[in-house]
Amino acid sequence: MALCGGGLWFITALFFFVEVHAQPVLEVRQTIRELGISIGTFPTGTLNAITDVPGVRVGHTTLRKGHGALVPGQGPVRTGVTVVIPRDDVWNHKVPAGSFVLNGTGEMTGLAWIEEAGFLEYPIALTNTLNAPLVGNGVISWMLKQYPAIGITDDTLTPVVAECDDSYLNDSQGRHVTEQDVVHALESASSGTIAQGSVGAGTGMRSYGFKGGIGTSSRVLPEADGGHVIGVLVNANHGRREQLTILGHPMAPHFSKVQAPLQTTEGSI
């Protein structure tokens, strides 16, 4: 998904996580830019995140519980939900929107209305595949609290929920993400620095045979091209080890001595 500021517009791209609300303690790792590798040609925004676009807020609820062998319906739990709020009062100040599907193995509810109407009027949520309906309920509950006239004297809504399969690391049958988890992510959504990696919807994801998860970036266009800020947020859960490249260079040969990749399907992003 991408957001652009300076005349706000919205694009959703499908190339195609006891209740725990505390943020996990994660190892701080260097970003690829901190390692001296620069991706792309345009400069990044201040945060190099989707929240460089004015008004955009992101929130996570991360669920980690249990260890050991899978017990369907119980755990271990490695999942969560991530939400993107395009702007304040988006119901009354809608943003132009569109979609593009590259990999049809991912699903996203609410796209039919976006394609028909050409705008977005509520937050986007990301989560695991089997939790998508419950997460949609959470978005609806939050929206009804914010806008009590929905479905009575105002229009109704179809929540936008994108899913990825985290069943390799998570007890997906347990559908552990609750409506309260979704509301927590929405209520705690903020601008500024975004937690990345194994957080929110990315908690149980894997990519290119390694641990995947949430990533974000931004670019600032030249003034001659409008000076817009373009922000992107992804939930990476795709790719085989041999497909991983950085700046066009295959990475698989450099990982021949590490753990063999455990990838069963193409996945989605």
Language-model features: where?
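Bacterial N-terminal signal peptides
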Residues: 6-19
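N-terminal secretory signal peptides that target proteins for export/translocation
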Residues: 1-4
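Alpha/propeptide regions of enzymes that mature by internal proteolysis
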Residues: 23-269
